[in-house]
């Protein structure tokens, strides 16, 4: 991966994280209306018409929330394959929750999710001053748990929401410092 993606935020071994753009809307809508992907997110598929979704999407791009940041995930060829975000940003506690979606199934179980998580965590901890990044993953989603563990996350608790059981995992900034040799 030697070319620079437009709006590049961070680069991993397999993926580039970049700013979201309006041209992502068709992919994002397709993924948000996909029943299987919604199940992995403990959500219902988005039911609104594309034009309504597009209006909301434009607003999010024009007026981003200070409590969340959404990024596109690209592969080495520059194809938009998913999204990464951090949200529930708490500047006082110096932490944020993360989430990723690989919407293109041909990239599942091939290291792209792990690389996206590692790249996102490294970016957050190096640029924000946060001390902790955490996530919640469904207790039955073994593939996601494996990717998060390979990325350095450790289980720190459990939670329940909307009839779903979640495993809470965390990554501490001090761990990144240890990986870099102090």
Give the role of each language-model region:
Residues 2-25, 33, 70, 74-182:
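Acyl-donor (CoA/ACP) binding surface of acyl/acetyltransferases
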Residues 35, 60-64, 128:
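A general structural signal marking secondary-structure boundaries and capping sites
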Residues 58-72:
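A short helix-loop-beta-strand connector motif used in the catalytic cores of GNAT acetyltransferases and
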């Amino acid at each position: 991966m030697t070319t620079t993606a437009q709006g590049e935020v961070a680069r991993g071994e397999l993926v580039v994280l970049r700013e979201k753009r309006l041209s992502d809307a068709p992919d994002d809508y397709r993924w948000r209306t996909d029943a299987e992907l919604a199940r992995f997110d403990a959500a219902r598929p988005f039911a609104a018409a594309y034009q309504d979704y597009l209006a909301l999407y434009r607003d999010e791009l024009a007026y981003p929330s200070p409590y969340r940041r959404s990024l596109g995930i690209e592969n080495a060829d520059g194809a938009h394959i998913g999204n990464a975000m951090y949200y529930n940003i708490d500047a006082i506690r110096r932490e944020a929750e993360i989430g990723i979606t690989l919407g293109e199934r041909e990239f599942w179980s091939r290291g792209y999710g792990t690389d996206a998580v590692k790249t996102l965590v490294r970016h957050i901890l190096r640029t924000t001053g946060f001390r902790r990044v955490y996530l919640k993953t469904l207790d039955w989603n073994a593939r996601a748990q494996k990717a998060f563990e390979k990325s350095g996350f450790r289980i720190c608790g459990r939670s329940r929401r909307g009839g779903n059981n979640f495993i809470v995992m965390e990554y501490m900034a001090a761990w990144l410092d240890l990986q870099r040799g102090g």
